[in-house]
């Protein structure tokens, strides 16, 4: 998922339209995956015994939609490094949420490791991190996206307790698209690409970043505490910063 801000920079659609297409173009592949999952494992999708079974899906979809909207705008209003690093502060909010909602306990080793990981991510980004007053709104959006992503991680853990990775990914995509679509229409109208040059960054976002990258995250959340999974995502700003340095000549 470290490639996400790179594809977004290449996208010629508006930020929210980019977020919508990231989800919409992923849905066909996720449907195929769900069909395969049902056939192979005889699992079930969207079979809710009560409203409580539906709540995690609704929360996952809402938080992911909020994260995508704010994150896509942040990348366009500040540097790739700033947006990525601030968004990955979600690890802190995820740890707090894990403690409050799941009773997760963290050892001194984990806390020290988390601190070192955060400091390491900041130091590896080096001078690419810029605190420019002109970018303050974009920086705030990046931080707000971190809070939304923490909500997504915590809700995903709850959803994965009952449903497969394929089911959570498909359910999240459908609900997120429902939330994002009216926002895109309200802003500037949904931008529909007309050339391959306009389509390829969106396809990359949908198929590589979302279907592959996001699915691996959701899969891992069934086997790891939310906070520990979030710590692993701190490699994302390093990857994004490296690509931004190479492709966009952003300082590193």
Model-derived features: positions:
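Glycine-/small-residue-enriched transmembrane alpha-helix faces in small-molecule transporters
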Residues: 1-21, 30-33, 59-62, 70, ...
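Specific alpha-helical transmembrane segments that line the substrate/conduction pathway
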Residues: 17-28, 72-103, 145, 226-245
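C-terminal-most transmembrane helix of multi-pass membrane proteins
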Residues: 23, 34, 38, 127, ...
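Hydrophobic/small/kink-forming positions within alpha-helical transmembrane segments
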Residues: 2, 6, 31, 61, ...
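Juxtamembrane C-cap of transmembrane helices in multi-pass membrane transport proteins
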Residues: 3-13, 18, 25, 69-78, ...
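Loop-to-transmembrane-helix transition segments
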Residues: 44-70, 137-145, 192-212
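Hydrophobic transmembrane alpha-helices of multi-pass small-molecule transport proteins
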Residues: 34, 97, 106-127, 145-146, ...
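Helix-helix packing/entry segments at the starts of transmembrane helices
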Residues: 83-89, 156-177, 210-246
């Amino acid at each position: 998922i470290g490639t996400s801000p790179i594809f977004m920079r290449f996208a010629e659609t508006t930020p929210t339209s980019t977020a919508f297409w990231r989800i919409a173009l992923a849905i066909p592949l996720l449907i195929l995956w769900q069909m395969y999952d049902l056939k192979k494992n005889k699992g079930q999708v969207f079979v809710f015994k009560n409203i409580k079974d539906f709540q995690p899906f609704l929360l996952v979809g809402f938080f992911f939609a909020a994260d995508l909207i704010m994150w896509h705008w942040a990348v366009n209003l500040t540097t790739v490094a700033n947006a990525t690093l601030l968004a990955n502060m979600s690890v802190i909010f995820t740890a707090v949420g894990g403690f409050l909602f799941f009773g997760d306990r963290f050892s001194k080793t984990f806390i020290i490791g988390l601190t070192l990981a955060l400091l390491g991510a900041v130091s590896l980004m080096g001078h690419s991190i810029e605190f420019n007053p002109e970018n303050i709104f974009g920086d705030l959006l990046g931080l707000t996206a971190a809070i939304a992503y923490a909500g997504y991680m915590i809700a995903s853990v709850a959803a994965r307790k009952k449903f497969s990775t394929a089911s959570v990914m498909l359910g999240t995509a459908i609900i997120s698209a429902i939330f994002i679509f009216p926002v895109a229409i309200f802003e500037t109208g949904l931008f529909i690409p007309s050339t391959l040059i306009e389509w390829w960054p969106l396809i990359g976002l949908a198929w590589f970043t979302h279907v592959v990258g996001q699915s691996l995250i959701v899969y891992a959340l069934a086997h790891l505490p939310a906070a520990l999974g979030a710590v692993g995502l701190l490699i994302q700003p390093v990857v994004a910063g490296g690509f931004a340095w190479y492709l966009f000549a952003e300082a590193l």
